Regions:
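N-terminal cationic and glycine-rich segments that engage phosphates or anionic surfaces
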Residues: 1-101
């Protein structure tokens, strides 16, 4: 199952289970994927989707720092939940210990 198929299946599951944060986060990612495909007139592969996911996580982490400084705990919690959803689809990063081996 490709990453795109997995996102679509998880989106449907989130809708059925009324998981709004998960559904909205996956929806944002699906929109970014669709935008890429329309702009470049080509089907995106898993590596491209992983790149989009990494950018989405980075954007949310950058905004998270600003929200923490401003004391917006509601947005901090929301963005943390979105980051958690997004990181489920990213490939696992090698730890520093594994890199040394």
């Amino acid at each position: 199952m490709t990453l795109k198929e997995r996102l679509n299946a998880d989106f449907k599951e989130a809708m059925k289970n009324k998981q709004t944060v998960r559904k909205e986060t996956i929806s944002f990612v699906r929109a970014a994927i669709k935008q890429y495909e329309v702009d470049n007139r080509e089907e995106i592969d898993d590596a491209g989707i992983a790149s989009i996911l990494a950018k989405q996580v980075k954007m949310r982490k950058d905004a998270l720092a600003d929200f923490e400084k401003a004391g917006r705990t509601d947005l901090v919690e929301s963005y943390n939940a979105e980051i958690e959803v997004l990181t489920r689809y990213l490939p696992e990063q090698l730890s520093e210990d594994s890199e040394r081996l």
